[in-house]
Amino acid sequence: MASYKNIPSTAKGSPISFDFSFPQPKLDHLRQVLELHPLGREAPSKTLRGSSKPQWFGNAKEIMRRFDWAAEEELLKAFPHYVVGVEDTIGGQMLQVHFVALFSTSPDAIPVLLIHSWFSSYVEYLCLLSVFTERFPQACDLPFHVIVPSLPGYDFSSPLSRETNNAQINEDNARVLNQLMVNLGFGAGSGGIGGYVVHGGVSSLRMCYTLAKEYKDCRALHANLDGAYRHTLTSSGGDEFEAVKSVLAELHPPEDWDSHERDMIRLAISTSPVSLLALIGSQFFGEQEQGAALRMVALIVAHHWMTDTYPDASQESYCIKDMSAEDLSHVLKHTGLEPNKPVGISFFSHGQGSASDIRPIVDGSSWSSRHEGNPFVAVLDQPNQTVGDLLGFVRQVQKQHS
């Protein structure tokens, strides 16, 4: 593999290479717990999503139990890892932020920030990084600087320590990630488009939108979304806010949970990798009983368990509303953002009819594409499509800035 380790000379921080190895006693404990922990009986409810079904659940558990951790660590370390100190501009806390990166040596490379969802990790994007290195085997040909951070409190990134209310979690994380990009030399006024492009999915969209709306350093937004959003908006008879709310309601945790209930759930999740699998697996909406996507979901769960990410991040995840109906409508209609900040959306049909049935995006947004498939596992299951969409969207962004 070519070297993608040339950190731009404009970087203000001092990222250092990061290595890790999971201790054998912890690996043995993980395997032992998986062997001893039974699966529960199938729930009588017919509302379970695909990844909550016992067969899917059992397959994922068995994959984790049989992991060859020498091979898995080799996969995780296939791309350069870094840590860097980032000072939170509110409160002054110095955080260690972990990220995986592919740095281009092209003077025209555009920085792209890939944000994982609250139930996932940087591992989610390893498939995309593989596609980038296969398509662009030389660092001088790579059109992007690709930055994949671990959110504060996840995996190898330290958590925010200051008191914050639930509504501020996305805003706090966005502030830290924007400062990371500025420290790497990708802030406003830098070469190319004068900043960076942010990409996310359904459950990280609010954070992406916050970056695009609040920070001049973020110059454009791209997201993978469920075709249900577009389908609902175009069939709602004009009452788009209520229509979008009905879609989002399926993704939101109950709002009436009190702190005691959240703490109990947090405790339950943190006691077993099987409990963690139930939480994370249910969010991927996967119907695959085997395959690469299932294996990557199992690896994400095991990685969280090995790094004690839960309970660090689990309480946050249960408090986050993915996005308000009003904000989602703003993204789809490209309102609330500066006119020169393009928005690109890749819609996935996900049971809403064929991709061709999803009409073009609402007037005002800059770019859209339509695909068959599941947006929650698109970066795992269809990484080539996501890379292709990013390339197409960013080329258009570059034209607007040329």
Swiss-Prot record:
EC numbers: 3.-.-.-
Molecular function GO terms recorded: epoxide hydrolase activity
Keywords, ordered alphabetically: Hydrolase, Virulence
Family matches, as SUPFAM superfamilies: alpha/beta-Hydrolases (SSF53474)
Domain of life: Eukaryota
GO biological process: epoxide metabolic process
Other observations noted: Gene clusters encoding host-selective toxins (HSTs) are localized on conditionally dispensable chromosomes (CDCs), also called supernumerary chromosomes, where they are present in multiple copies. The CDCs are not essential for saprophytic growth but controls host-selective pathogenicity.
Family the entry assigns: Belongs to the peptidase S33 family.
Protein name: Putative epoxide hydrolase AFT8
Source organism: Alternaria alternata (Alternaria rot fungus)
Organism lineage: Eukaryota, Fungi, Dikarya, Ascomycota, Pezizomycotina
Gene coding for it: AFT8
